[in-house]
Amino acid sequence: ALYPMAEEPLFHIHLNVDYPFNLTGILYFPKIKNNVEISRNKIQLYCNQMFVTDSVDNIVPDFLTLLHGVIDSPDIPLNVSRSYLQSDANVKKISTYITKKVADRLDEIFRNERQQLEEKWDNLKLFIEYGMLSDEKFCDRAMKFCLLKNTDGKYFSIEDYKKTIESEQTDKEKKVVFL
């Protein structure tokens, strides 16, 4: 276990990139039992292995601040105002990279271990839906691995569900209607 008194995380994401910026770290999706447990500031930011902050609002996309973990990057500007941090090119690249890595990991689990994703979906759904609403690029990627659950508890990818309902739920303009 990562923490002795905590439940196993749903899954990990390893970060390691040297170009166009330098970044290492590990992020993980915690298991959420109820809404009271959702807390931010669980990602610690380091610069050259020196603790900087656990407020990573500008570095980690808003919908991913619910993740836990550690990020280390010598390319984060220090001793600057928040407005400068927001406009720093490396910070924007790091944010985009983290979003892509999360989407890639979820897609990998969907393709290779779909049963595992279905078992964990109720815990992940909150993160993924929030991300789809707040980040267009993440939404485009998430359309591949996002799951829908029917009343019988069976999971469908959006594409599978569309194929299932297409014959019965197509309007006169030939568009599928999701109910």
Regions found by a protein language model. Give the residues of each.
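Conserved GHKL (Bergerat-fold) ATPase module
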Residues: 1-178
